[in-house]
């Protein structure tokens, strides 16, 4: 049985969206058990599942504006902290939260703990591409600064995830840069390029540019945390902008535009789904001793369900243990 500790109080629509996502996951997956951490009375308002689920009551939670490290240290009974401690103590196999991203990263670093020989765990998510397959990118902001060695480790981590969780036999690994030529970039990018090119275990395809990411140029894209986070926000903003422009064009375009939208309803719905990368799950803090997964703060029940499905796959394929063995040299 796969045991997942869930912070029921994190996120914009908690606990309703969290609990409703859990209800659906428990209905569909008979091999998971969920531990819900949070206000018992509020959780019970939405909990319909009766088997393989437990509630661990706490009145304390971490707010979105709390300073991450201080919150983890001072709010010992916060729902997120208790969920992370359950993983550390072996009572759960993974932790999920839609709450404060920085606090969850701190919980992953300081409570769950790093895998031996991994210097800086990175935040990774599967982002959308025009062909619907998506690409994995890290680091998306777990670290403000990185070395070439860190980026090399991210390439290995991302490749492991793409193989074992997404089922890509030979993931194409690209280094995000300001040009595709091998000589491009600052000293960090140049040194990283040399390390990736020398690693025969990677299917390294060279430098990739930001404009090509959504065209599916690579399966795994490596970046430092600052750059990766900027690209993530750019993709999110572009997706919202496209949908906003379409909505404005339809509502302001008169009867013809509305009739056209009606005819294209299924296509427009498909486009919206394609741009909504939360359907594939949450962002993984990769490089810690168990799956620590952050679903978007505005996640609905469907996104929570997708993230639980993602965690289930990670546990099924034992990707964290495989990663630990790889980095320990076993």
Curated annotation (Swiss-Prot):
Q: Which domain of life is it from?
A: Bacteria
Q: Which InterPro entries match?
A: FA_synthesis, Phospholipid_synth_PlsX-like
Activity regulation, in the record's words, is:
Magnesium ions lead to a slight increase in the catalytic activity.
Coiled-coil regions listed in the entry: none
Pfam families assigned: FA_synthesis
Pathway(s): Lipid metabolism; phospholipid metabolism
Residue ranges annotated as transmembrane are none
Q: Which GO terms describe its cellular component?
A: cytoplasm
Xref: NCBIfam families: plsX (TIGR00182)
Subunit structure comment from the entry: Homodimer. Probably interacts with PlsY.
Which family does the entry's similarity section mention?
Answer: Belongs to the PlsX family.
Name-wise, this protein is Phosphate acyltransferase
């Amino acid at each position: 049985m796969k045991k997942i500790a869930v912070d029921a109080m994190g996120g914009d629509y908690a606990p309703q969206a969290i609990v409703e996502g859990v209800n659906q996951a428990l209905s569909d997956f008979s091999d998971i058990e969920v531990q819900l951490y949070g206000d018992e009375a509020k959780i019970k308002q939405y909990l319909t599942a009766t088997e393989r689920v437990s509630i661990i009551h706490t009145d304390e939670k971490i707010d979105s504006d709390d300073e991450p490290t201080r919150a983890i240290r001072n709010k010992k009974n916060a729902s997120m902290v208790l969920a992370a401690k359950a993983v550390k103590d072996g009572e759960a196999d993974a932790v999920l939260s839609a709450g404060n991203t920085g606090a969850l990263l701190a919980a992953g670093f300081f409570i769950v703990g790093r895998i031996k020989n991994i210097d800086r765990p990175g935040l990774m998510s599967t982002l959308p591409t025009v062909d619907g397959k998506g690409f994995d990118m890290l680091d998306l902001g777990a670290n403000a600064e990185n070395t070439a060695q860190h980026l090399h480790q991210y390439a290995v981590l991302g490749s492991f995830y793409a193989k074992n969780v997404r089922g890509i036999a030979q993931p194409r690994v690209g280094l995000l840069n300001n040009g595709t030529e091998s000589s491009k970039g600052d000293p960090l990018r140049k040194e990283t390029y040399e390390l990736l090119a020398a690693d025969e275990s990677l299917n390294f395809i060279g430098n990739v540019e930001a404009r090509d990411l959504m065209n599916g140029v690579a399966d795994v894209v490596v970046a430092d945390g600052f750059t990766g986070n900027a690209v993530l926000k750019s993709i999110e903003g572009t997706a919202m902008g496209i949908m906003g422009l379409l909505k404005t064009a339809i509502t302001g375009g008169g009867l013809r535009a509305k009739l056209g939208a009606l005819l294209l309803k299924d296509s427009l719905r498909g486009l919206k789904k394609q741009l909504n990368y939360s359907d594939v799950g949450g962002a993984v803090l990769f490089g810690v001793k168990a799956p620590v997964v952050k679903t978007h703060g505005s996640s609905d029940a469907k996104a929570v369900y997708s993230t639980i499905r993602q965690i289930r796959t990670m546990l099924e394929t034992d990707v964290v243990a495989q990663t630990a063995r790889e980095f320990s040299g076993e």
